[in-house]
């Protein structure tokens, strides 16, 4: 017999399974209810008790945006949600375009020096973008990482492999009280010495000493240990009991002898001695890996199979506590409680054969092995001067060269490398900087803030390829601009595809004699339909469109002020009604709205009315700490702003500029060199009387006839 099915709360027995729009069943309590239509006129008809369910499906129901948790304040009909996501202010995309820009330490710097002598121009796009990338590069190069010898003596080097000293472990979470740290734990090198049983118990009872991150690894070890030890409990219980009884009798007789002698000793030393004897007895009878003689007791108590299983599960602990030798000669190879992933390093595994005899010297001189030889290192000391007397190294060029060497070659300068099994190359490089010591947080930008600016990177950039390791590269730059989802395709096409990738020779054309130092540059393209030019703003760190103002409008700026009610000068633009100002602001692009909002309070309020339609919202997160020591990230506030997108440009038009040949006629670097002195040709350098070789003369030289043997 089946169980009776109950209707959902609020539903009637008939209404639960009725889907007829023309249902005419009479209304009865607890059975059926009236059939109604949706009050939003979506066309649905249903029983009145299903109205709450219909609100979850009605396409005309007002619901918040799907990105309401990310800051979107708009509400709309349910059927408009998908279309709204394309223009949602909370649907933000970060541009991940990357490019490489290398330093110019090996190239000619005449052009870079001449460019920096001139006044910086917004129209020189490659120079402005290179200067911006140079600022980012200088803020990312840490001096201590490139030159570890220049670290300040007061600072300690960071611990390797994530190990921290005892002094650094203090805190609310995961900290260890210094008073509870056993004597076997060194605070300097972080190595764990062998602990006594009393120190283990104190450390185990201390809640602050627990390493919760490695709890799973500890639990796995102890579970295997318990499983292996459980096999030996039954066989070793009798033997351990007999030994304990005999040792207790010896301890009690010893105490009676001491009391009978009547020596003037206190009770506290006797109790300490008793506890020490008990611990000694436990150390010699237990089967734990840290107890003495555990392997000898296991050999007699269990069979070979259980003994080998115990070694497999407790091998690391037995090696650490000195019960068995390690498989490698390195001491302290396995540290209990520090089960960290070891970094895989490539080593040279070449072994010299027994019959190998190195005779590299005979490759050049057979008698070199007979000559006396001596070991001598080539170093800066061979110059006969001290390091202080050496000329100061260029800080910027030296830093960029060392960073470039590690990036392109894969290793630092002066790295030792093994040639074969017998020889190794050693190299040293001495640098003498003006500041002799650097702190751990010092970057190259901090040291070059007071020096005059210069251009130390290439003007042209390169695309990132698969051969280049961009994860740890200091010369890989990222756009990292935020845009709304509908703005991102326009940004990528206009900025990265049309402008940035075509700066070297197409969108922007430099003089052919630029390698000699000529700074002349031409921009070939402009937006269609208007007189404007493309610029790069250092303040906004992005490209923008700057319209060309007519001369008559520039002259009328002086008379562009009116007198207000208080006799003060009032700008004619601010005197317009708010509706007209908002209408005018609607024609501006996002980057122009961002600049207009910083003009005055009135313009800021006008631009604020366009934020939901043209702007985007970002969440600022803040880390919150609780009283128990835990942390979490919470939304601190919402930030509304405009993106850096300029006007949409589908196609470009050619600028009305003169030909580059016209510039070459007056280029100061285009110097014509007239050759007046005669120059000998190649054929004139040889002797004039020379036998002419021909095919006939070649055959005449050959002897005729046959040789008879």
From Swiss-Prot:
InterPro entries: F-box-like_dom_sf, F-box_dom, Fbxo30/Fbxo40, Znf_RING/FYVE/PHD, Znf_TRAF, Znf_TRAF_N. Keywords: Cytoplasm, Metal-binding, Ubl conjugation pathway, Zinc, Zinc-finger. Its main location: cytoplasm. GO terms for molecular function: ubiquitin protein ligase activity; zinc ion binding. Residues 570-624 form the F-box domain. CDD domains: F-box_FBXO40. Residues 240-250, 262-277 have a biased composition (Basic and acidic residues). GO terms for biological process: muscle cell differentiation. Expressed only in heart and skeletal muscle. It is found in: Cytoplasm. The expression decreases in the dystrophic muscle of Limb-girdle muscular dystrophy (LGMD) patient. Probable substrate-recognition component of the SCF (SKP1-CUL1-F-box protein)-type E3 ubiquitin ligase complex that may function in myogenesis. This is F-box only protein 40. The gene is FBXO40.
């Amino acid at each position: 017999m089946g169980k009776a099915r109950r209707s959902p709360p609020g539903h009637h027995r008939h209404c639960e399974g009725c889907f007829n729009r023309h249902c005419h069943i009479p209304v009865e309590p607890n059975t059926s209810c009236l059939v109604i239509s949706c009050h939003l006129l979506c066309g649905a008809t249903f029983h009145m008790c299903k109205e709450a369910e219909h609100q979850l499906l009605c396409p005309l129901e007002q619901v918040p945006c799907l990105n309401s948790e990310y800051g979107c304040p708009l509400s709309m009909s349910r059927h408009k949600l998908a279309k709204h996501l394309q223009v949602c202010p909370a649907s933000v995309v970060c541009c991940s375009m990357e490019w490489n820009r290398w330093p110019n330490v090996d190239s000619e710097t005449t052009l870079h020096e001449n460019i920096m002598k001139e006044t910086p121009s917004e129209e020189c796009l490659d120079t402005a973008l290179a200067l911006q990338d140079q600022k980012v590069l200088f803020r990312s190069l840490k001096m201590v990482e490139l030159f570890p010898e220049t670290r300040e003596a007061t600072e300690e080097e960071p611990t390797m492999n994530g190990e921290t000293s005892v002094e650094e472990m203090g805190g609310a979470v995961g900290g260890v009280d210094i008073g509870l740290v056993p004597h076997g734990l060194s605070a300097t090198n972080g190595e764990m010495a062998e602990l006594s049983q009393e120190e283990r118990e104190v450390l185990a009872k201390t809640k602050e000493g627990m390493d919760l991150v490695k709890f799973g690894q500890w639990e796995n070890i102890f579970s295997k240990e318990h499983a292996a030890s459980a096999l030996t409990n039954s066989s070793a219980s009798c033997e351990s009991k007999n030994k304990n009884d005999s040792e207790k009798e010896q301890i009690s007789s010893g105490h009676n002898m001491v009391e009978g002698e009547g020596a003037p000793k206190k009770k506290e030393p006797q109790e300490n001695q008793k506890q020490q004897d008990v611990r000694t007895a436990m150390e010699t009878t237990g089967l734990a890996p840290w107890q003495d003689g555990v392997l000898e007791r296991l050999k007699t108590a269990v069979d070979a199979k259980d003994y080998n299983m115990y070694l497999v599960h407790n091998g690391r602990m037995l090696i650490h506590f000195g019960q068995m030798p390690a498989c490698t000669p390195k001491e302290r190879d396995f540290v209990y409680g520090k089960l960290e992933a070891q970094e895989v390093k490539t080593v040279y595994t070449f072994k010299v054969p027994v019959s190998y005899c190195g005779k590299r010297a005979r490759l050049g001189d057979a008698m070199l092995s007979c000559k006396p030889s001596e070991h001598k290192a080539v170093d800066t000391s061979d110059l006969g001067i001290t390091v202080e007397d050496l000329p100061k190294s260029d800080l910027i060029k030296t830093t960029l060269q060392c960073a470039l060497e590690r990036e392109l070659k894969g290793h630092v300068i002066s790295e030792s490398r093994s040639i074969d099994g017998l020889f190794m190359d050693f190299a040293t490089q001495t640098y003498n900087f003006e500041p002799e010591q650097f702190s751990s947080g010092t970057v190259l930008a901090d040291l070059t803030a007071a020096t005059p600016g210069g251009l130390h990177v290439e003007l042209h950039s390169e695309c990132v390829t698969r051969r280049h390791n961009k994860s740890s590269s200091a010369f890989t730059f990222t756009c990292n601009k935020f845009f709304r989802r509908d703005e991102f395709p326009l940004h990528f096409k206009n900025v990265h595809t049309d402008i940035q990738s075509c700066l070297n020779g197409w969108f922007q054309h430099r003089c052919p004699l630029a390698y000699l130092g000529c700074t002349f540059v031409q921009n070939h393209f402009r937006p269609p339909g208007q007189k404007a030019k493309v610029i790069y703003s250092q303040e906004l760190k992005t490209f923008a469109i700057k319209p060309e103002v007519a001369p008559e409008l520039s002259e009328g700026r002086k008379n562009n002020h009116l007198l207000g009610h208080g006799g003060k000068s009032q700008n004619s633009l601010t005197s317009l009604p708010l509706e007209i100002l908002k209408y005018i602001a609607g024609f501006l692009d996002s980057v122009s709205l961002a600049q207009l909002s910083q003009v005055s309070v009135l313009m800021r309020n006008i631009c604020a009315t366009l934020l939901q339609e043209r702007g985007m919202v970002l969440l600022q997160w803040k880390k919150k700490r609780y009283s128990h020591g835990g942390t979490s990230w919470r939304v601190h506030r919402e930030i509304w702003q405009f993106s850096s997108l300029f006007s949409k440009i589908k196609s470009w038009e050619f600028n009305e500029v003169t030909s580059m040949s016209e510039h070459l006629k007056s280029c100061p670097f285009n110097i014509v060199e007239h050759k007046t002195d005669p120059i000998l040709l190649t054929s004139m350098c040889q002797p004039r009387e020379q036998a002419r070789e021909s095919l006939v003369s070649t055959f005449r030289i050959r002897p005729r006839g046959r040789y008879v043997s």
